[in-house]
Amino acid sequence: PFYYMTVVQTFYFASEIKALLPFMEDIRTDMDGLKDYLTFQFCLSGKTLFSGVRELMPAHYISIRDGHVKFRRYWQVYYNLDWDHTEKFFMEQMEELIWDSVRYRIRSDVPIGGYVSGGLDSSVVSAIASDLVGNEAFAGFTGKFSVSRQYDESSYAQALADEHHFPLYQIDITSKDFENNIRNVIYHLDEPVAGPGSFCQYMVSMLAAKHRKVVLGGQGGDEIFGG
């Protein structure tokens, strides 16, 4: 993300809100942002929970010249309905695009890893990536819950790893881990994130950092496919 604010005719920007805090005259809650969060579980239209701090909207850039700040949109989604092709054609086209997307993101001179939750999105990405780079160069990472088995989906992640023959590193996440790490999670998030998944992702990321520098995930699948 790109966060920015203007204080006493000075334009500040950073990739994290915490980097802007020392330059704020008064740290206050943005009530409109808070209303958005409580209603939609996120802030709308570039608002944040900090008064005076904004987030650059997607597909926009900022132009600053002679003290004037302008916002410009450089990309827009256009939907063109195609009734001339079959469902099979679109399925094949989508498969090709997904493979190309993963192929584009594994261009690295270090071994690749993948977050494997056991769900569809991360499983597809990790399966394709492991096939592209070779199972010896790929590794999966997942969390499991031995104490709360009703929430544990590590068996699905293991099934994927077995099918594609890549190693799967697992971390058993406990309530003690939550107690010891929740402050770090809050610090790195800057703003609250609806849902408990960010904590689990933090723990799995700590595990992955010991083995890989580049790790792919399945985030964004719901937004793209309407899941």
Model regions and ranges:
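Cysteine-centered catalytic environments shared across enzyme families
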Residues: 1-189, 201
